[in-house]
């Protein structure tokens, strides 16, 4: 069976058109494929756990590629070091493992965790400005937290799925939707079994309406019931969003073990 290299990737999405290759645009996927071609001498297809949009970041994107018959592709740690030596400063391979199983970055995933960061300051601090959204109005965090609990569980999230995409189903399960406040930053932690296009940003947009007092917390129940995205608020901007973690079942739990104790980034 062909071996696969599995990568855990962090990136700052500011300068990119998203994960997926697009003509006449710079994508994370294309940068990785270009670097792999430099190492191997031929193009290698890289498959991720999911596509992040333009401007969206990642702390724990997962991607894999089939391991070519090449001397540089025998040791995952060496692959990690070579990639990090050649990648731009805003893309880092956090970890790399080799597997000979049926693992697939997308289809083997059982859960994902996204985090959206809000700044409560009218002007974010310089080192936060590329990674958080400042709504510039006062937010009632307690009301937002109350509203968030209405979305936890299995629901039809059609009202939170952007138009223009075809879905086999808009039913998803949210395991967690919590707000964590620390000093002047609020992090919306959203963990579920899968997400529709712009679903997290649309949820955050709805929570912002609750937080500024436009609607009561129970309004999210009405949104679920309408199943109509056109009646929802605008999406929150992409730059506050990050793909934090992707979960896999045994025996593919390498990065669950490494998430908190991987002190070396291989660069």
Curated annotation (Swiss-Prot):
Catalytic reactions of this protein: uridine(38/39/40) in tRNA = pseudouridine(38/39/40) in tRNA
Enzyme class: isomerase
Gene3D superfamilies: Pseudouridine synthase I, catalytic domain, C-terminal subdomain (3.30.70.660), Pseudouridine synthase I, catalytic domain, N-terminal subdomain (3.30.70.580)
Annotated active site: 53 (nucleophile)
EC code(s) of this entry: 5.4.99.12
Domain of life: Bacteria
Sites where the protein binds substrate: 114
MF term (GO), any: RNA binding
Family designation: Belongs to the tRNA pseudouridine synthase TruA family.
SUBUNIT field: Homodimer.
HAMAP family according to UniProt: TruA
Function noted in UniProt: Formation of pseudouridine at positions 38, 39 and 40 in the anticodon stem and loop of transfer RNAs.
Protein name: tRNA pseudouridine synthase A
């Amino acid at each position: 069976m062909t071996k696969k290299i599995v990568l855990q990737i962090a990136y700052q999405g500011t300068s990119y058109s998203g994960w997926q290759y697009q003509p006449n645009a710079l994508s994370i996927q294309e940068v990785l494929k270009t670097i792999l071609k430099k190492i191997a001498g031929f193009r290698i297809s890289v498959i991720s756990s999911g596509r992040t949009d333009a401007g969206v970041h990642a702390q724990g994107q997962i991607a894999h590629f089939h391991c070519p018959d090449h001397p540089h592709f025998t040791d995952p740690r060496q692959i990690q070091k070579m990639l990090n030596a050649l990648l731009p400063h805003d893309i880092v391979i956090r970890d790399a493992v080799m597997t000979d199983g049926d693992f697939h970055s997308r289809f083997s995933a059982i859960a994902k965790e996204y985090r959206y960061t809000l700044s409560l300051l009218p002007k974010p601090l310089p080192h936060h400005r590329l990674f958080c959204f400042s709504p510039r109005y006062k937010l009632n965090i307690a009301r937002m937290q109350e509203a968030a609990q209405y979305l936890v569980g299995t629901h039809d999230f059609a009202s939170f799925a952007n138009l223009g995409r075809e879905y086999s189903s808009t039913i998803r399960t949210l395991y967690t939707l919590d707000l964590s406040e620390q000093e002047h930053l609020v992090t919306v932690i959203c963990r579920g079994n899968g997400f529709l296009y712009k679903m997290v940003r649309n949820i955050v947009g709805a929570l912002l309406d609750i937080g500024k007092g436009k609607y009561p917390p129970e309004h999210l129940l009405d949104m679920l019931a309408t199943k109509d995205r056109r009646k929802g608020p605008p999406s929150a901007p992409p730059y506050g969003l990050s793909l934090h973690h992707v979960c896999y079942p045994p025996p593919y739990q390498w990065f669950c073990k490494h998430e908190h104790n991987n002190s070396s980034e291989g660069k």
